[in-house]
Amino acid sequence: MQKIFDAHLHLWDLGKIPISWIKDDEKLEQNYDFFRMKQEYKEFEFIGAMYVEVNSDDLEKEALFALEQKKLHNLLFCLADFKHKEELSSFREVMHVSKKGAKRLFEVDFEEKIEILKTFNIPFEACMKNEEL
């Protein structure tokens, strides 16, 4: 059986995490939980996943949800918040939602984040649109 590690897994429970950007999209405006995902991979030997933040409206609620998923399902996780940096496998910032787009990379607080990432040896994922590259 083919082994699979999902390196970019989004999960959400709309009762726990507010996510306004999925409103009015019937395919997205529903819960996507770990067991639903496991069903999608039933033809594979699932060996793990990296939970990636979903750009929710409440980073703290999402961090708590992600921590719960990590403990329940032994997931790695990538968040956009340093509050739980000792638990992070990776850090993510969604650039295309910033008014400055990729220019966000040159702001002082972003440089400070990079220093924290270097100190704690945490990989970084930038999410941006192709035209911003």
Task: Describe the function of each predicted region.
Residues 1-68:
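An N-terminally biased module of ancient metal coordination in phosphate/nucleic-acid-related enzymes
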Residues 57-132:
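Active-site gating/metal-coordination segments in enzymes
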